[in-house]
C-alpha cells in the first residue's frame, strides 16, 4: 500500500489521486517547504487523508483534523505518550527517526497507542530529507503495530522495495524524491514507480 506525502497543489492532488494510492499526506508544520498554509481547492475523496504535525498543540490538531476531514494524524515530532493518549478518537501514525538499531526501540513508548508507526531517516530537519537509512536495522522491530517504510525512497528503488520484507511492513511512504519542486509531485515518475512495484 502506498502513501504519498507533502501534497499541496489542487491539480497535482487530483492527478496523484488517480494513480490509485492509499494515503495522501498534507503537512501542517509551518517550517516545512511543503506547508499547507491554506485549504487547497481540491482534496482527495478516493484515498485517505493524513495530516502531518510536529509538536503542535492539541487544540490545533483537532481543529485541522475536523476542518480537513483527516483520516489519520501523523505525529512527526517529540510528542509524548501522554500527548498521544489525549488524541483519543483519532487514528494516529507516529513517526520514528532512525539512524541505527538503537533508534528502533523508541517504538516501545507508543506501542498500543497508535495505529501505525512510520520509520523515517533521522535528519536535522523533520522528514523530507531524501536520504535513506539502512533498512536492515528494522529487523530489530518486534512490535505488534504495523509500520510504513519511509525515508528517501526514489524512482530507482522499486526492486529494492519489492525485495524488502518484514511481517509488519504494510505501506511505503513517498515524498521528496518524486518532486518537481517542494509540494509538487512528478506524476509520471510516480506512475512508473507504482507500475514497477505492482509488476510480478
Where are these regions (language model features)?
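Conserved N-terminal beta1-alpha1 strand-loop-helix module at the mouth
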Residues: 1-200
Amino acid at each position: 500500500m502506498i502513501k504519498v506525502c507533502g501534497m499541496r497543489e489542487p491539480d497535482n492532488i487530483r492527478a496523484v489521486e488517480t494513480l490509485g494510492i492509499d494515503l495522501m499526506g498534507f503537512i501542517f508544520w509551518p517550517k516545512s517547504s511543503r506547508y499547507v498554509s491554506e485549504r487547497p481547492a481540491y482534496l482527495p475523496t478516493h484515498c485517505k487523508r493524513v495530516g502531518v504535525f510536529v509538536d503542535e498543540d492539541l487544540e490545533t490538531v483537532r481543529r485541522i483534523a475536523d476542518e480537513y476531514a483527516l483520516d489519520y494524524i501523523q505525529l512527526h515530532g517529540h510528542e509524548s505518550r501522554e500527548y498521544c493518549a489525549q488524541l483519543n478518537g483519532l487514528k494516529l501514525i507516529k513517526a520514528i527517526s532512525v539512524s541505527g538499531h538503537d533508534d528502533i526501540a523508541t517504538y516501545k513508548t507508543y506501542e498500543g497507542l497508535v495505529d501505525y508507526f512510520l520509520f523515517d531517516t533521522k535528519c536535522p530537519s523533520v522528514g523530507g530529507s531524501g536520504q535513506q537509512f539502512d533498512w536492515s536495522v528494522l529487523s530489530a522491530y518486534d512490535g505488534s503495530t504495523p509500520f510504513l517504510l519511509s525515508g528517501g525512497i526514489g524512482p530507482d528503488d522499486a526492486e529494492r522495495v519489492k525485495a524488502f520484507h518484514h511481517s509488519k511492513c504494510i505501506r511505503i511512504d513517498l515524498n521528496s524524491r518524486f518532486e518537481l519542486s517542494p509540494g509538487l509531485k512528478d506524476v509520471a515518475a510516480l506512475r512508473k514507480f507504482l507500475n514497477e512495484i505492482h509488476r510480478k
